[in-house]
């Protein structure tokens, strides 16, 4: 694509504004140098990566990437044999390794498809990172802990400095030297500790003059008493520098062996930072990727620069569906140009794998070139008029464009007589049609409007205009023709009436009729579009209601099947129980050689009724009824009903339960009787689940709670131990799902603490 087109459509300006979403200069440079992608396969891969990253970002609400240093030069230097990196360069490599570790850890919690390769390029080097952290501090100084020798040398340096200090303090405080001392100060000159002495008294203090003040009134003397110590200090500092160089060489050599991993990780970090920047822009303005296709349909499109600069902007629909040409008409008030530039810029941004501010359902083609003719191209240097410059640019555009390109013309053709401009403009549109090139053009010329109305290659549209404020509304009305508004604006701005009347008399009746018809036509189109909008809204509501109904029907069918499965299982279990009891009776008959057990069995079972689902549903639960929780065996008596809940007494424990969780059973006066009595089991007020799997523990706990209720316990303990917390969490999740009103908490420390959960039933 031509750089002049990118500039004209403000693509570079957009990228510059987008780059403000990152604090990293290297990422900013990469973003500012982005170019639209024309290869479909490559673009789809980049969009897939951006979409996958954004979904992770939106799910987590953050990404662990902030400002990081640019280590490009350090990487290049480390690749040079025998080179030694500076402490700052090594520290910054350590910073990058820390960021890589954090990002890798964060992404490890997500299933990656399109980002997998980029993720694999992140290589945390924890040992190297620790070496660097232990060796260099945030002020880029080598730490004492970098080596034992360095720690020893620095300790000696401090000791010698202390001795020098003490010696010089004695001289400074000696009464015999007070008239010779310029200031009680110990300072450094030429890396040696000295004291300031008045020039006229320099002979009083024996030593070496290391420096003189700019005024000449002060000399800096190194007393002979500290010369040996200063010499020793100099030697120690040389040793320190050699040891630091040795440490830096060691660290650089390690870095050099890992330089490819570091380089790949750094490149991957930059790519993730670019994706992060794109995702932040997308989230801020509710952007999305349109579907790639042949048609060009952008719904509620917004100009991104308006958004980034927080300027008000009315969303527009840009539609090139079955037709490949769109001509936008209307007065010269800026609305047409904004629509044209919005279409071009959004296409460029999309082809940079950046989501754009449009609504769901939008579609867009991939263009191999987007070319625009806009503005005043007058060139003094090339001695070209505005018209000549436009013609030269249009010729180049038409030479470069093909059926996969997008041509944008702002006002066909400016800078010349309207009749000639109309003729050339129509000829250009005809040429574009012959070459089957997509085109969006703007015009206010009536002949071009008439041509477009009679040509099925093009769709015509008009930009709305507010007659009160004399400004464009920016809304695009399709199948409408824009008025010139010249007379109306002149009249509104109080141009002399006789001038307006004279002007009208100079215009042909055909043109006035055309403008009048265009105005009426636009009004009808607006009314028609409003009706269509209402119909579409009703259609959407109908679709939603239909979807709700279908989902409800599916759920009812599912519930019905599940209910019948439960009923069938109950019947099968019941039949199996009867069969087993029958076997026991037959066995007893054989053993006793008597029919009495059989007669008793028949008598007990002959009055058993199996009710249908409908009969069970028809029964209403009321006070005094014997009920049980669906799926459970314990039975209780309803003692009160309030709205959709019942208070049930289970062997002394009273619990409020939703009615839809209860099922009615025959009360005890009917033929088949049930009675809740306290069992004579040896159940204790605690259960030990340690050593069991999650499934085993929950199954055993379920049985235990049934018995606890029957025994009348209001408090019990669940012993699950500490471990990894799996059993504890499973127990508490199970308790949360129970229909009983209960509370639970960790046991006191002396009763087991976190390894024991205490449960209390509440009335």
From Swiss-Prot:
Broadest EC class assigned to this enzyme: hydrolase
EC number(s) from the headed UniProt entry: 3.1.-.-, 3.6.4.-
InterPro entries: DNA_mismatch_repair_MutS_C, DNA_mismatch_repair_MutS_core, DNA_mismatch_repair_MutS_sf, MSSS, MutS, MutS2, P-loop_NTPase, Smr_dom
Record-level Gene Ontology MF annotations: ATP binding; ATP hydrolysis activity; ATP-dependent DNA damage sensor activity; endonuclease activity; mismatched DNA binding; ribosomal large subunit binding; rRNA binding
Keywords recorded for this protein, A-Z: ATP-binding, DNA-binding, Endonuclease, Hydrolase, Nuclease, Nucleotide-binding, RNA-binding, rRNA-binding
Smr domain: residues covered: 687-762
Disulfide bridge map: none
Pfam families: MSSS, MutS_V, Smr
Binding site for ATP: 330-337
Gene Ontology biological process terms from the UniProt entry: mismatch repair; negative regulation of DNA recombination; rescue of stalled ribosome
Function: Endonuclease that is involved in the suppression of homologous recombination and thus may have a key role in the control of bacterial genetic diversity.
Family, as annotated: Belongs to the DNA mismatch repair MutS family. MutS2 subfamily.
Subunit comment: Homodimer. Binds to stalled ribosomes, contacting rRNA.
Name of the featured protein: Endonuclease MutS2
Taxonomic source organism: Sulfurihydrogenibium sp. (strain YO3AOP1)
Gene: mutS2
């Amino acid at each position: 694509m031509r750089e002049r087109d990118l500039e004209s459509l403000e693509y570079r300006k957009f990228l510059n504004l987008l780059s403000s979403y990152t604090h990293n200069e290297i990422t900013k440079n990469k973003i500012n140098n982005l170019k639209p992608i024309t290869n479909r396969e490559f673009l789809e891969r980049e969009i897939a990566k951006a979409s996958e990253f954004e979904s992770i970002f939106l799910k987590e609400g953050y990404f662990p990437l902030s400002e990081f240093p640019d280590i490009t030069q350090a990487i290049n230097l480390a690749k040079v044999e025998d080179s030694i990196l500076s402490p700052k360069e090594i520290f910054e490599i350590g910073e990058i390794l820390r960021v890589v570790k954090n990002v890798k850890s964060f992404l490890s919690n997500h299933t990656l498809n399109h980002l997998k390769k980029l993720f694999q390029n992140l290589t945390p080097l924890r040992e190297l990172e620790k070496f660097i952290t232990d060796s260099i501090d945030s002020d880029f100084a080598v730490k004492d802990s970098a080596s034992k020798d360095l720690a020893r040398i620095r300790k000696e340096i401090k000791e010698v400095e202390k001795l020098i200090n003490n010696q010089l303090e004695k001289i400074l405080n000696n009464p015999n030297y007070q008239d010779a001392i310029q200031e009680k100060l110990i300072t450094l000159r030429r890396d040696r500790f000295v004291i300031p002495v008045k020039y006229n008294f320099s002979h009083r203090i024996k030593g070496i003059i290391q420096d003189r003040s700019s005024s000449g009134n002060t000399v800096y003397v190194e007393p002979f008493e500290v010369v040996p110590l200063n010499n020793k200090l100099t030697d120690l500092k040389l040793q320190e520098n050699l040891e630091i160089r040795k440490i830096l060489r060691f660290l650089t050599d390690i870095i050099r062996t890992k330089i490819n991993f570091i380089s790949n990780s750094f490149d991957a970090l930059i790519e993730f930072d670019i994706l992060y920047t794109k995702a932040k822009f997308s989230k801020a303005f509710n952007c999305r990727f349109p579907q790639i296709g042949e048609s060009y349909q952008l719904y509620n499109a917004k100009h991104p620069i308006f958004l980034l600069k927080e300027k008000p902007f009315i969303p527009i629909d840009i539609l090139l569906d079955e037709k490949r040409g769109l001509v936008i008409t209307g007065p010269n008030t800026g609305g047409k140009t904004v629509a044209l530039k919005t279409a071009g810029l959004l296409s460029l941004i999309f082809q940079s794998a950046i989501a754009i501010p449009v609504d769901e359902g939008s579609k867009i083609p991939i263009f191999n070139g987007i070319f625009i003719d806009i503005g005043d191209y007058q060139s003094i240097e090339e001695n070209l008029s505005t018209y000549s410059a436009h013609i030269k640019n249009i010729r180049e555009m038409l030479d470069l464009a093909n059926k996969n390109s997008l041509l944008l013309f702002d006002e066909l053709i400016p800078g010349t007589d309207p009749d000639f401009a109309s003729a050339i403009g129509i000829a250009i549109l005809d040429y574009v049609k012959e070459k089957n090139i997509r085109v969006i053009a703007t015009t206010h010329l009536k002949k071009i409007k008439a041509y477009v109305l009679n040509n099925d290659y093009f769709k015509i549209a008009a930009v709305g205009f507010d007659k009160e404020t004399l400004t464009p509304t920016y809304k695009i009305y399709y199948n409408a023709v824009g008025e010139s508004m010249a007379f109306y604006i002149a009249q509104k701005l109080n141009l002399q009436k006789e001038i307006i009347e004279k002007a009208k008399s100079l215009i042909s009746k055909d043109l006035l009729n055309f403008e009048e018809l265009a105005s009426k036509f636009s009004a009808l189109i607006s009314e028609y579009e409003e009706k269509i909008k209402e119909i579409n809204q009703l259609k959407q509501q109908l679709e939603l209601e239909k979807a709700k109904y279908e989902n409800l029907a599916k759920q009812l069918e599912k519930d019905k099947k599940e209910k019948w499965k439960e009923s069938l299982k109950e019947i099968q279990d019941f039949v199996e129980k009867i069969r087993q009891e029958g076997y026991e009776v037959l066995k007893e008959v054989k053993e006793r050689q008597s029919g009495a057990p059989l007669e008793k069995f028949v008598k007990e079972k002959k009055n058993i009724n199996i009710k249908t689902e409908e009969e069970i549903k028809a029964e209403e639960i009321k006070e005094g009824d014997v009920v049980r929780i669906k799926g459970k065996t314990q039975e209780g008596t309803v003692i009160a009903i309030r709205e959709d809940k019942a208070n049930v007494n289970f062997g002394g424990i009273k619990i409020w339960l939703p009615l839809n969780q209860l099922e009615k059973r025959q009360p005890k006066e009917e033929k088949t009787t049930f009675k809740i009595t306290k069992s004579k089991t040896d159940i204790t007020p605690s259960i030990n689940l340690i050593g069991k799997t999650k499934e085993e523990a929950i199954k055993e706990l379920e049985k235990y709670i049934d018995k606890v209720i029957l025994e009348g316990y209001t408090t019990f303990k669940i012993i699950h131990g500490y471990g990894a917390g799996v059993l504890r969490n499973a127990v508490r999740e199970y308790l949360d799902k129970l229909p009983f009103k209960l509370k639970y908490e960790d046991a006191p420390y002396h009763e087991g603490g976190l390894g024991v959960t205490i449960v209390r039933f509440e009335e």
